[in-house]
Curated annotation (Swiss-Prot):
Segments forming a coiled coil: none
The species this protein was found in: Mus musculus
UniProt superkingdom: Eukaryota
Keyword annotations: Glycoprotein, Membrane, Phosphoprotein, Repeat, Transmembrane, Transmembrane helix
Pfam families recorded: HEAT_Maestro, HEAT_Maestro_2, HEAT_MROH2B_C
Lineage: Eukaryota, Metazoa, Chordata, Craniata, Vertebrata
Membrane-topology descriptor: Multi-pass membrane protein
Glycosylation sites: 200, 210, 255, 267, 296, 541
Protein name per UniProt: Maestro heat-like repeat-containing protein family member 7
Transmembrane segments: 548-568, 722-742
Modification sites for Phosphoserine: 356
Amino acid sequence: MALSRGTSLILHEDPEKIPSPNSCEVPGIMSNTTPRPTPDLALAPPPEHALALTPALHPALSPDPEGVSGPVSNDIPSHNASGATTPSSTQINTVDTADQGLNHTSGPDAAGTLCPDSQPARIPSSTQANVLSPENSSRPCSEDVSKSFSSKVFGLGQSNSNPSRPEPNLYIKALSREALVRSHNISRQGSQVPLLLPSNTSLDRLHSGNISKVNLGIAPNSNEAITLTSHTIFASISKEALSAPWNTGSKGSINGTSTIQPRSGLNVTVTHASHVSMIPGSSEGLSLQSSARVPNSTLSPSSCMTLIMDSESPSMDSSFLVTDTSTLTLSSHRDYSEDNSIRTMPLEENLGKWDSLQGVTALQSPPEGTSEDVKVNEAEKRNHDNKAALVANIITYQKNQEMVEMKEEKEATVKMMMRQIQEEPLDSLLSPARRQAMEILAQLSHTKPILSVRERVELVNTCVRSVFSLPSVQAMQEKDESKAEVIQILYYQTLDSLQKLLNALFIEDPTPTGLKSILEPLGPWMNSGKAHERARAVNSNVSVLNHTLVTLPFLISSGFPTLGLLLGRLLLRIGDPDEEIGREALDGITILYTILDLQKRTKNKEDTNKKELYENNKRFLGPYNPVSPCQNILRVIAEFGDFLGPQQVRDLLLAALEGLKGISETQGKDSGEMMQLASEVMLSSVLEWYRHRALEVIPEIMQGIYMQLTHIQEPRAREVALLPISFLASSFMTEVVVALLMCPLPLDSNGAEMWRQLILRKPSCDVRDLLDLLLTSLKEKPVTKKGRASIVPLAAASGLCELLSVNSCVGRVRRIYPQLLLALLIQVHYHIGLNLPSRMAPRKDSKDDTQPPLFIPVRWMVKVVKTLLLKMGCSYESAFLEEQGGWELMGQAESHYRGVSLLARAMVHYSCQELCRILYLLIPLLERGDERHKITATAFFVELFRMEQVRRIPEEYSLGRMVEGLSHRDPIMNVLSIRGLVILACKSEKMAKVQSLLPSMVKSLKNMDGMLVVEAVHDLKRIFKGQGKKLTDSAVYVEMLQILLPHFTDAREMVRASCINVYGKVVKKLQTPRTQAMEEQLTSTLMPLLFIIQEGNAKVSQKCVKTLVCCSSFMNWELPKKAYSQKPWDNQQLTVTKICKYLVSSHRDNVFTFLNQSLEYAKNSRASLRKSSVIFIGSLVPCMENMMTEERLNEVKATLEILRHDPEASVCICAAQAQDQIMATCWRNSWPLLYGDSWVCDPSSMHRWSPSCENLPTSHQRRSWIMQALASWKMSLKQ
């Protein structure tokens, strides 16, 4: 314990006085003293700075290279040169410093004073350190609060009892307030011997630690006074008040806990105390004073306690904790005080707050010249439960604080040692630093708290890598022949230190989890390509197993940790080219078998001798056979059957695969063949005898094989690694296929080889059953019920593609070819736009600077369809789709049905042999599934109507299904139904029935996309041609014209041209006499045709001219000849005026219809139509004369005003021109001024200047209308 945080102080007892028989020394590495569970404790503070390579963790744990080797008992006092012993008064000294150094044990000098110049005690060096065994390691108890270690050493300062005087050593004072240490005197009555350090101690001594041991039990006299002077003291005095060990608190203070009954004359004086805590265990009185000038106090009554606090400065706090007293008087004063005051408060009121250390009463020292007294009165009787709870809470709090500090200190030390080990070179061994660090770590393993699993694994990994990565001892000796002997000794010492560390870590946590954290890091090293690394790993594993067998502290109910991996790796080493490694590996397996057997016998409550059991098992497993080690492997696998569960079988197989990695690179040909043989024997025997136990771990085995194949390059080794697939598939094909479906997509070479292994190697599975499983997977939706994407269908398609690459499988695939084809086509539709979970397989052949191609599921599915067609001999069909772009159409959402139709049409054209099977298979499919399923099936089914065999199908399955499709809510189903009916109409016996359905077919085209309308109308033309003039009801034609007219303005050129062309052909089908419906429909077509002619698209314009001629011919219109001209109207104002005058004069009843259509086209998204409509409006309105109303004129005004700000400049100019024409016509015809209309101005005001240009007509503003239009257009562009 320390007087301040960071001090390194141990209190030693005086050998000449009455020693305490229960004192407990600090156990050292070579200490012969066994610690006993007594309250006497060795004290050391937590570290605050980084430790050196060999830090002064603890006087007993610090290897001292300069000290004399050999065990030292702490019970023997140190002597000086003259042989004088320490006097009755001992001394406690602490001085803080910011540096570290070596720790020495201070002995008394000739004058009887302990000083740093004394001869240091003998401490064992690091080279002679022994690992602490469980029998001699210290254990924490309720009073033990100092199990931590420290590397901090302290310098010495002069005593200064007067607070007003300056410090003689300013440097030490500047270190920290808590580092200023006063003199500590323990004196007897009548014999006051001060134990002070020399005042002239230099700063060089700051690097040495002074350790002395004092026992307060040296005062048998009842009148003895104990005086302690310190800057910060935390004293805890319990029921027994004489022999007290001292411990550091959580804040670097001192706790004193008495161990025997108090004497009647005991006086305790504490001066310069900042924190005082007293916990009496009985009602016996205690008196505690803190004053620099007050003499020894007398014993107070049991009902009261007096505490006088004297601070060194006005800012220092004084706090205390007292229990089991009825009256508490507190006084805090300073010398030269001018005012004193006393305060009293009952303790019972604050007992609830005293449940933690937060309840400590703190007195702030008043300024100089003032004093304050406080009296606290407590009830005579206190509740015993409250007292017990208070004491328990305080002890618990102190323990928690100490545990936290110890944990942090241990973690910091472990990390520092690990860094030191990591800094050691991996190619040479010239320093004992690595060994010393591991020895320190081994010693730390005996302290609490224990390391976590993650920390232990990290520690073992660091140490193992640092030692195992070293070259062989022969190589290191050859590199430095002059130090060959030293290197050899240091090498074996390092290996021994590592093994002791591993054993110590197991002792620290002797549980299955703790054993697993040690064995796991060792495992991969047994498969190293270097013999010396394998030998070290095998030796360490065997040593840990041997230590486990000797200790065996636990009963493994869930099986030995990592049994499968450990057994598998040791089995591989039996076949190692180095016979010594094989022999030691077999011995390790024998120990492992003995452990398992012993656990089994212990569970059955059978008494067994470990040594005899080991010898019997050694004979039972047989001697090592270097000629044929595979015999040993087979024997071991057979005998371990009772201990192998599913997890162990999995680990055995994966361990066998580990032995196949890197054979060609790291080992010779013979060695590689031996390892392959050992792995193959292991795999074959385990799968032959225990494959039924691997059923539940098949997915994990498949995943392990996939991962290991990436590291196995040698062809023969890859064949061995793939053996478990064919073995397991022969018995559990469904489970194996399901596991293979989880391989990352797209399949790389490893995944593809695993699929092909199902049928390439014996024993192989039934291909028929395998294909049926894949077909079942292909029928699943790639989206689960919860909306999550599933890779199962795509994985099944990928597996099918790999199986098709095996020629022997093609014949079996033909059996279910129709089902596979339809299932794949439906999956193509499902995978359009589908984002699957990211399970991309890393491409080992891809370069770092090249991005792998983006994996799009639908394209991969289309590729599988193409592969299936080619394997089934449909190369012509595949080429046809390639030419027509059918594969691209098939992978798009809006055109998927077109790609499927192209494929079916090609198969019909090239007379595919499987069409009849597909036709009969499709009939039930039309009633199943969702919309995508039905669309794909219907698209294929409709094209099969071209076959002659369709006549055999009942009419309800052909014509009936198509009639139902006409009323389907999906437009694509409507189009497909129309196509099916048109194809059926080619059959003479079906023509009449299909023609009767023409009105329903036309009606189904309403509200349909333009492209679908064009496609459907293209099919309907066949019926119109075949019908001729037989159709007497013109309503069908009129309805067709109504459906086509809205698509005249479609954004797609092909749709516009097709609809306009069909419109003209339908008009030709019309017969006289004209009905009102016909006239209204054709009249509503006039303006659109005139505007579209001005579009500027030659192809569309030509279709419009033809259609306009057809309409004019049927309606007897006499339009001006230039109305059919495609020349722009920009410079043809007279032509537009003639057309408008003709329309007003000849179609007076429809003039407002024409105006409304013009205003509607003025809002069209295409600029060409807006410009044509504006030009037409500018000529039509003046021709209407008095027909215009105010409401209509305002509507025209608003439309033109908006168009003056159109993004298209030509539209702005045309809008301004139209305004000028309309205004000029109004003034010329002397239109009356409309009320409240500022747009039409008085002609008389046109010749006067008005500052408000906004109210003037456009033609009378200072700028011309062209400039105004251009300015408006520019403003609109800026916006």
